[in-house]
Amino acid sequence: MERYTQDLSLLVKQIELLEEQQQKHYFFYNLFSPDPNPYNKAFEEIIEYLISSSEATFLIHHFEDFSHTLSIQQQKQFQKLNDYYLRHQFSTHCFHKPYSEALYTLTALWIKGLRGESIITLFPYLNLLREFFHLKYQKQLNMKEVKYMDVLKSIYGVELTEFYYQHIKESKASFLRLYRDYIETFPSEYIPIQHLNLSKEDTMTVLYDIIRIAQSVISKQTILINFGPNPFPTIYQNEETIYLNLGIFTDFVSALNQCLKLLGEVFILDYNHSATTDDKSETEQRFMKHSIIGFCTLLPLLTDSLTKVIVNRIFPDNKGDSAFLEKIHEELTFHYFKTNKVHNSIESYQPLQEMLKYFIELEIEEEWFDKKFDSLDLSHQWNLRIEQYLNKTPHSHVEGVLRHSNWTKGEIGVAFGKLSGYFSIFCSGLPKEPYDHPFSEFLEHFSGGKLRWWRPNYQLYSKLKMNEESYKCCWVFFKQKINHFR
């Protein structure tokens, strides 16, 4: 048995090295090319070669029968190996081609849509992809038929999925009312950009100051940031350095948003490589990823520490001026909420609007997966709900298809994860309120320049499990926060 577990670890290590090289390739492609990122199938082809070997097949069938003998870490390794095996097996069944070829085709068609070209040939592939998802999860969950909720439970865990799914559904009407009130009053209270119209150089200076605060968490690695010609931000790390490519520079607020999202990824990288995660499940780690990234994205709304960084670096003569600090903070939070689009990106960066798009994305993905409509109807379903919920016309007639880019990576349930992450931030009230908020310690260390003492451990995860009473506070505090920065 020991020999088999060693073989399993070695095989998974080879796969992880290939994944790392693939990530490196994507990062440097985005760094130098203005075009959307094509799918490089070479790495997946090598993985498919490893998976199709007699050794890999034997290990998979062996540990299917003896998975109870594996440690938690070894179970993670087996899950990774088995996931690749199922991808390869059912891709051949559904697409009549290897998984690498199928994803290459899906990605190429998605890129055509980004360029404004016809994607009519994508829809038959999406029907096949849905069938692929069903077969994969039927085998993985040992069920004859699977529903969308079954998949979410397998990805994020039963307890968290049931709790957040219920409250996401219950909160949709409240979010819609708040959004409509928000857009009705927003134009009349417009705050012009007077101080935050920063140059690319000044923006880089401020972001590096923020990075220095965060870097105390990753003491052994240097963090470097840059702007590239590609609109899609990427992250890459080696043993010495973490590289953050923020994409195209347009303005300070958008750059800050991208930087904070990638900082969330940095914390996750450190978190996943720490010893505390070895005995934790993949479902818990996935949930923590969305929670921490969501939290970092909303930092300008939760603390004035970022405003202090801006004033200290760009306006040093106004360091002690509390009125000036408040003015900058008001300008920052206002425009951080109102920013909508960045060039060719199909995401918006107004947090409230983006949350509502996640509501729509979740609804559509569930109905699509459960076969309530055909893939050809995806764009119509999206456009209908964007107009109904947001009172807006989509900037592209195929936006509803392009929003689900995670499907081209073989991923599902991302919108639910992001919404759950946002909800978890407010589960116990806001950090400044007299409640034990899960991220209070982070903000305390962040504000005091002592972030090196903070780690996102699994005590944090246990605190993020919402209970009924804390949920009742969530909506009230969130509404107060948005009204404050309206």
Give the ranges of each region predicted by the language model.
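C-terminal substrate/ligand-recognition segments
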Residues: 410-429
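An amphipathic alpha-helical core segment
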Residues: 423-464
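Post-HEXXH active-site segment of zinc metalloproteases
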Residues: 253, 269-294, 308-312
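Contiguous, non-catalytic segments that form substrate-binding/exosite surfaces or channel walls
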Residues: 103-254, 455-457, 461-486
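Acidic/His metal-coordination segments adjacent to aromatic residues that form catalytic metal sites
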Residues: 238-252, 274-283, 338-345, 400-407
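N-terminal helix-rich structural modules
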Residues: 1-155, 460-474, 481-484
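Long, amphipathic alpha-helical stalk/connector segments used for oligomerization, subunit docking
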Residues: 302-406
